[in-house]
């Protein structure tokens, strides 16, 4: 079994670091001339996968936009996952789950067990019930060679009230975000060429005093239409092992499959130059 970190390292070398988010919200479906229903969802999502999945290292479906249509939406998500992986892309399912005990284990089984129809290469998780609450998901990821991306420094304006808070008993008065990165540093300590446990750090946070070098990947949402530039990525993440700038709107608003394909190929070339 090849760990997620090793597979991601190879995918970035082959295709480039760009991660494309698949976020079929109602406004975007309307822009495509599609109905805000399961049929519109399916047409949109599968056309995007066909256009870009053979050319990017990672696709990131946002589960909530599929879940809102109930079981039929989940069935579309299952097809998105399967077809993306068949095209050679790694699937990072954006679910941001976080719970304790048996519930945490159930989430792990749903998204990381290869026998599940929702099985993905990696998922996003929330550590704010305490990093140890993620232990069942961490161990399941290890067992199946999957990856995790842990929320650390998000770019939403509400994030700092939790993520910048100082933690009692941490040397130097470290922050919650810094503590999350320390945990990831330990999880990835022996991994080569790249750890499987990553962090979510917004491309638009401006600056940070936190050490982003932890031998694991960084998912950097906010790249492109949300304001993050290639210069921002290089300035903010220069010390990080592998950064995945994540773009959704810049790609999805293009609509034409050939234009989407050319855009992601060109962006990957620019990110690697």
Swiss-Prot record:
GO terms under biological process: 'de novo' pyrimidine nucleobase biosynthetic process; 'de novo' UMP biosynthetic process
Molecular function, one GO term: orotidine-5'-phosphate decarboxylase activity
Active site annotation, chain numbering: 96 (proton donor)
Keyword Lyase recorded: yes
Pathway info: Pyrimidine metabolism; UMP biosynthesis via de novo pathway; UMP from orotate: step 2/2
Pfam family, one: OMPdecase
Enzyme class at the top of the EC tree: lyase
Entry's EC annotation: 4.1.1.23
Catalytic activity: orotidine 5'-phosphate + H(+) = UMP + CO2
Keywords of this entry: Decarboxylase, Lyase, Pyrimidine biosynthesis
Transmembrane segments: none
Family of the protein in this entry: Belongs to the OMP decarboxylase family. Type 2 subfamily.
PANTHER family per UniProt: OROTIDINE 5'-PHOSPHATE DECARBOXYLASE
Name this protein carries in UniProt: Orotidine 5'-phosphate decarboxylase
């Amino acid at each position: 079994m090849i760990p997620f970190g090793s597979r991601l390292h190879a995918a970035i070398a082959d295709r480039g670091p760009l991660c494309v988010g698949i976020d079929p919200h109602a406004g975007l479906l309307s822009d495509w001339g599609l109905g805000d229903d399961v049929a519109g969802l399916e047409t949109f999502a599968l056309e995007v996968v066909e256009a870009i999945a053979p050319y990017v290292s990672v696709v990131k479906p946002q589960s909530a936009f599929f879940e809102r249509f109930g079981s039929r939406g989940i069935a579309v998500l299952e097809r998105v996952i399967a077809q993306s992986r068949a095209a050679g892309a790694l699937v990072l399912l954006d679910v941001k789950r976080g719970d304790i005990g048996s519930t945490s284990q159930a989430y792990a089984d749903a998204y990381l067990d290869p026998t599940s129809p929702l099985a993905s290469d990696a998922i996003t998780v929330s550590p704010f019930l305490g990093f140890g609450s993620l232990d069942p998901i961490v161990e399941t990821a290890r067992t199946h060679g999957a990856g995790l991306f842990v929320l650390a420094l998000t770019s939403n304006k509400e994030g700092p009230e939790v993520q910048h808070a100082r933690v009692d008993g941490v040397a130097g008065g470290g922050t919650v975000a810094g503590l999350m990165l320390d945990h990831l540093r330990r999880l990835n300590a022996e991994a080569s060429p790249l750890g499987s446990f990553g962090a979510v750090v917004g491309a638009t946070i401006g600056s940070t005093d936190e050490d982003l070098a932890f031998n694991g990947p960084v998912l950097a949402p906010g790249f492109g239409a949300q304001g993050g530039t290639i210069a921002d990525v290089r300035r903010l993440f220069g010390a990080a092992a592998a950064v995945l700038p994540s773009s959704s709107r810049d790609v999805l608003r293009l609509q034409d499959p050939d234009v989407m394909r050319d855009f992601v190929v060109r962006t990957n070339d620019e990110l690697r130059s």
